[in-house]
Amino acid sequence: MTYALEVDGVDKSFGGATILRGVAFAVEPGSTTAIVGPSGCGKTTLLRLVAGFEKPDAGTIALAGRVVAGSGWAPAHRRSVGYVAQDGALFPHATVGANVGFGLPRRARTPARIAELLEMVSLDPSYAARRPDQLSGGQQQRVALARALAREPELMLLDEPFSALDAGLRANTRRIVADVLAKAAITTILVTHDQPEALSFADRVAVMSAGRLAQIGTPREIYSTPVDVPTAEFIGDAVVLSARVEGSRARCALGDVTVASNGVHGNARVMLRPEQIEVTTDGAGVSGTVVDVEYLGSEMLLGIRLDTGDGEVPERVTVRRFGATALTPGDRVGIRVLGKAVAYDL
């Protein structure tokens, strides 16, 4: 297979500080990949290397089988790549139509083509006469996408394009952008620090940490079977407990739990997602006491101090509970584990 993008052994430093170390991954044509990680982990630098805004210190980058960095070099304007920045980077004193037309060859800058591009991103062609400051943040990002689409790129790079939008607008804009790119069958890479955004937007997710790729997989794989505890805790709420693993079972503060088979034995740590822990009021399962409650509307986050019954310092877990039944600090509850835990060597 010829990949839409291949990154192999890429390093990058600035001023003596190492930003990327041995980054390697491949992206299939027509797919959507999200690169997610905390601020400063190197994800935007990686995107800029792919775009051609920076040169790697080592390693190679190939687009559709053609080396564009490494043994050869192609500048940004000679790569079939679209780029949408966090702030959209629209020209503030130009009209929407002029902004979109900037991505077109001069002879193709016709009202009909600009109208077509605006309609692709669910904007009425009449918006062409407006200025960017007359649009909402979500509309501005869609104009930026239309400008990037004008070049008919083989690869679209999205650098945290939704982060400046409020929650409701962000979700709606994300859905529109995802739909546009899927219909156009354009290979897409999204960089974000928002874990739910990465999981919902992409076919595959790459988790970055300290300049390296910690794990690449489907959203379900990344969430359900993270490669290590730091990845588990970064990608979502996690309950991590000390345990003793024997075969497919582990003994921990929540009792005997089933673990996914991954070769871990003996003293270890096990990870569960909060939704795997069922809180009951009938006394079934391991018992504990509610010590704090965080109300989140349709759900509650409960801090529960577990009863160990053996004189040890009680272990505390945070679990998610749905439904209208109110619990308050001091309430006695039972806990049952649903599904399999993931075990990690110490």
UniProtKB/Swiss-Prot annotation:
The keyword Disulfide bond does not apply. The keyword Iron applies. It is found in: Cell membrane. Residues 5-235 form the ABC transporter domain. It is a peripheral membrane protein. Keywords: ATP-binding, Cell membrane, Ion transport, Iron, Iron transport, Membrane, Nucleotide-binding, Translocase, Transport. Its EC number is 7.2.2.7. GO terms for molecular function: ABC-type ferric iron transporter activity; ATP binding; ATP hydrolysis activity. It comes from the Bacteria. It catalyses: Fe(3+)(out) + ATP + H2O = Fe(3+)(in) + ADP + phosphate + H(+). GO terms for cellular component: ATP-binding cassette (ABC) transporter complex. ATP binds at G37, P38, S39, G40, C41, G42, K43, T44. SMART domains: AAA. Belongs to the ABC transporter superfamily. Fe(3+) ion importer (TC 3.A.1.10) family. The complex is composed of two ATP-binding proteins (FbpC), two transmembrane proteins (FbpB) and a solute-binding protein (FbpA). Part of the ABC transporter complex FbpABC involved in Fe(3+) ions import. Responsible for energy coupling to the transport system. This is Fe(3+) ions import ATP-binding protein FbpC 2. It comes from Rhodococcus jostii (strain RHA1).
